[in-house]
Amino acid sequence: MIKRRGNVEIRVYYESVRTLRSRSHLKPSDRQQSPGHRVFPGSPGFRDHPENLGNPEYRELPETPGYRVTPGIHDNPGLPGSPGLPGSPGLPGSPGPHAPPANHVRLAGLYSPGKYAPLASPDPFSPQHGAYARARVGIHTAVRVPPTGSPTHTHLRQDPGDEPTSDDSGLYPLDARALAHLVMLPADHRAFFRTVVEVSRMCAANVRDPPPPATGAMLGRHARLVHTQWLRANQETSPLWPWRTAAINFITTMAPRVQTHRHMHDLLMACAFWCCLTHASTCSYAGLYSTHCLHLFGAFGCGDPALTPPLC
């Protein structure tokens, strides 16, 4: 039926009601060649369809009902079962003989080799699953003690190297509470002090790993920049010059040589001390610097008083 609307010609086709009746009395060839009949991939007559007999790709389709080719899987050559991958016979994109089990995940046409977690956790005390208990013991990880009567496993013992030593117990005292100290500093000192506190928190959270050397070099560059700006802004003699000179000399020397957390701790404390010298009379961290920055005071003979030998 043809309808016209202006210059547009519309062709309308009506399907006869007789095509909706059962076609079981027809031959398979008649059902495939009849108009209006569609053969879907995976159906018994799909491979024998006249249009698909010469297509080698469809000749390999299985006859399992409900078989579905995931779209998009043919485009990724690095996936299992993709074209060009050794050991992948059959349809490109179909799982090969060494493909993972059926519990893989298919999302949006992508193949993910991830598997579901096992229902039961392995026994760490069995010989087969002993590797599950070989994880490195962290700061907050409790050491699992084997039950009474079980053989002692060396891999369950805590590594004595992970024990914090007495020398490392007082490292990195600058934490998140130190950020409240920013309002007491001049505006041109706050960015540097904030960087010092953030690096201190990062190193305290990763005390089991060596400190990154690039961080020490970055602190040295930042310290030299703010110290140069402070010198230009204070052309006249300032009583802070000796102390800030001692601090910046130590920072410049230590920054490129950071190897241990003790080095990083001393560098950070010297940087924070440099910042807080601007309000030395009211600084609430004066006691902290008196504990961790004695080496700076000793540089100018202001360390512990020398003991006078008795006269008799």
From Swiss-Prot:
Residues 20-106, 143-170 are annotated as: Disordered. GO terms for cellular component: host cell nuclear matrix; viral tegument. Induction: Expressed late in the infection cycle. Keywords: Host nucleus, Metal-binding, Phosphoprotein, Virion, Virion tegument, Zinc, Zinc-finger. Phosphorylated. A zinc finger (unnamed) spans 271-283. Residues 46-62 have a biased composition (Basic and acidic residues). It is found in: Virion tegument; Host nucleus matrix. Signal peptide: none annotated. One of its GO terms (molecular function) is zinc ion binding. It comes from the Viruses. Belongs to the herpesviridae US10 family. This is Virion protein US10. It comes from Human herpesvirus 1 (strain 17).
